[in-house]
Each structure stands twice: as C-alpha cells, then as structure tokens.
Amino acid sequence: MKPMAMHFLSGGRVRMRKTVYIPDADRSESIELPVICTLLRHAQGNVLFDTGCHPDVPENPASRWHGMEKFMIPIMPKGENVLSGLSGIGVEADDIDVVICSHLHPDHCGCNAFFRKATLMVHARELEAAQAPEAQAVAAGYLRADWDHPAPAMTPVEGETDVMGDGRIVLLPLPGHTPGMMGALVRLENSGAFLLASDALTRGGQRPIRQRPRCLRNS
C-alpha cells in the first residue's frame, strides 16, 4: 500500500489580542496566528482537516464575518486560502473525498461549501452548539453562512472515529475551545504519529495558568 502523505496548507492568518489566550499578558500585546489546514493523501482518498477562511475575507472582512473581524483581524493577502494551496500541489476541491471539521468557527470551516463532493465530518456536540439559538451572537464565534450548506451534508460523529478503517486517521474529541472540537491522530509510516490539535493548543510555550482564557469554554 502506498504510504500516506501529509501536506500543511495555509487557510489564512489572523491577529488577536494576546490576553485571549494568556489572561495575564500585557493588554497592549497582540499575536499573529496562522490558520493551518492539513491534506492527508491516503490510499483510499484525499482527506482535508479544516478548510480555513473563506476567500472573500481578506477584501471584505466585515461583510463576511459581521463584526467578528474586530477581535480576530484577518491579515492574509487576497488569494491566501486552502483552495489556492491545494491547487498549488495539483489538487482541486472536487478531488477531496473527506473534510474533517475540527470545529465550526469561520477560520476553520470557511471554505466548506467548495468541497461539494466530499463527506463532511463534524462532532455531534459541535453541530448542536452551532445550531443553538445563542450561537447566532457574534461573541459565540459561529457564522451560519460558513457551515450551514445543503452540500456537502454534514455527517455527525461521536467518540473516537477511525476515518478510513485502518487506524491511520483517528478522530479524537478535544472539547474545551468549543463543546465539540476534534483533533486527528495521524499515523505516518516513516515519520510516526502526529496529533492535529487545531485550537486545543494555539501556540508554543503555553503553560498552566491561574485564569481560564476567554478562548476556552466549559464542555
């Protein structure tokens, strides 16, 4: 069987106040965060972990994010998105067989609608959270325009889920940042195991803290 390949692609870049992640940081400090999408080229098909920001965000952030851009400021240039990243390695949207949504914030599911032929997997608790009435507030972090599409239809999953049935891509519940956030444990033949943790860990150097960051929620 052909070894699985893993490609990291840019889904955008944002700037946020550092206190969102580290409560005791200086309030004047900000941090730049890459939005990472991951393509897994499995023998049974192409699997994409997260789809990043919508292509319209760099030029029209307010019309796309409806106020969310005030605290999650997009800083990537036009054309920096997962679609162009895929195209650069010879993969088009219709070549993707499975899309895994770590969670349904717009910097992680913004391009979902472009993958019309894919099976789209999301944790059942995450879908429930995004559909809740209170999720319509900007502060909740969900935008229906980015995740609620007739195609591809969402496939809710619960617990650990073996995506391809061979143990190479296993979805793991990682609640905290959102109620139904998931990571993916990826096992490569030559390089070993990797955990795609999404926003469960946003930057190196994070440490035990005295206060709960605003980016975490009780789950």
Stretch-by-stretch model annotation:
Residues 1-7, 166-170, 190-193, 201-219:
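Accessory terminal helices/loops
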Residues 4, 13-83, 184-200:
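Conserved beta-strand hairpin/beta-sheet module of binuclear metal-dependent hydrolase folds
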Residues 8, 37-41, 47, 159-189:
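Core dinuclear metal-dependent hydrolase active-site scaffold
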Residues 17, 56, 104-109, 179-181, ...:
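Active-site environment of divalent metal-dependent phosphoester hydrolases
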Residues 48-51, 97-103, 122-123, 172-176, ...:
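Active-site neighborhood of phospho(di)ester-bond hydrolases with catalytic His/Asp-centered motifs
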Residues 60-122:
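Active-site metal-binding motif and surrounding structural segment of the metallo-beta-lactamase
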Residues 63-69, 138, 208-215:
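Short glycine/proline- and charge-enriched loop/turn segments
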Residues 74-95, 124-173, 217-219:
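Metallo-beta-lactamase
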